[in-house]
Amino acid sequence: MTATRRTAREWAIQMLTAADLNPPDDVQAFMNGYWNQISDLDEEDGGPAEAKGKLKAFAEERVAGVLGSLKELDDILVPILDHWDLYRLGTVERAVLRMGVWELKNTDVPKAVCINEAIDLANWFSSPKSRTLVNGVLDRYAKAVSR
């Protein structure tokens, strides 16, 4: 498999989901442990080491960014969720929404790309119903910040 930014986002969601279930004391050590466990970075996948390093950095930026600003991200999400408690959502949905808001807030990735990537991640790791939730929440946030 050739790794892409989509793959890096998948890695980030896997790490964020694991971190939500068992919060790490040392984020870098946590990420290093993850890299030691996955097979996507094996030499036989054919991708150049430099490209893999950039994708690892892309994923790590998101994981460290989200974990470093959980309270801020949750404070943004709670009012948008209306009458839903953040912890009533599934772990995957929380991770996808947090990373989606973080990307919208902290990167120059176009809003439509951020939202579509988050929708696809929710669909891949959770269920088709999650797509609707993620789309609605991130779209509301994107519209609110662009005013």
What kind of region is each of these model predictions?
Residues 1-147:
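N-terminal interaction/assembly modules
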